[in-house]
Amino acid sequence: MKVQLTGISLLLLVGTGYFTFDVISPVLLIGAGIGGFILAIVTIFKKEWAPITVPLYAILEGTLLGGISYMYNSSYNGIVTNAILLTLGVLVSLLIAYRSGYIKATENFKLGIFAATGGIAIVYFINFIMGFFGSGLGVMSINNASPLSIGFSVVVVIIASLNLVLDFDFIEEGAEKGAPKYMEWYAAFGLMVTLVWLYLEILRLLAKLNSRD
């Protein structure tokens, strides 16, 4: 699979985020979030539409990330730059480790990451439901700088990082099997989703660490 499509997707994501960094419009952010979610669902169930849905998703997700990043940076100056650098560092390091054969996506590895990711998703879902009742899990709060809360974020960052290995494996497997063109866009979508998740989790972790000051 061609890496150019991944590059295009990330360029749209980052570029849109950059230009909407200081555009604080609740309507725009909510619209981008809902639109991005819908496009993500469509992409998952209609992979052949990926050449159209993925670039649009990147633009909407970039808009949402721009607003989120601005809010974090307003509270903790410089946190966004640090989060971006750390995300890139993790991406490059794991890519080198994967290409060098130090990390391999074995079946047991995949099963473990799938299970861990599913567990994290359940925790987030529980916290989401609790939010409707004016409550929430303490470890999820960015203002909670307790060892347990920080430890939870570290674990989530590690799991999010290891999901990149699954993306690398998917891209490599698709290239070896001569996957159709639209699957190149779908692979780019998967990698982009993981990177966005990793970036947001690093932001949360850095916010918790900064809240101790």
Where are the model-predicted features located?
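A hydrophobic alpha-helical transmembrane-helix feature that marks the membrane cores
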Residues: 1-213
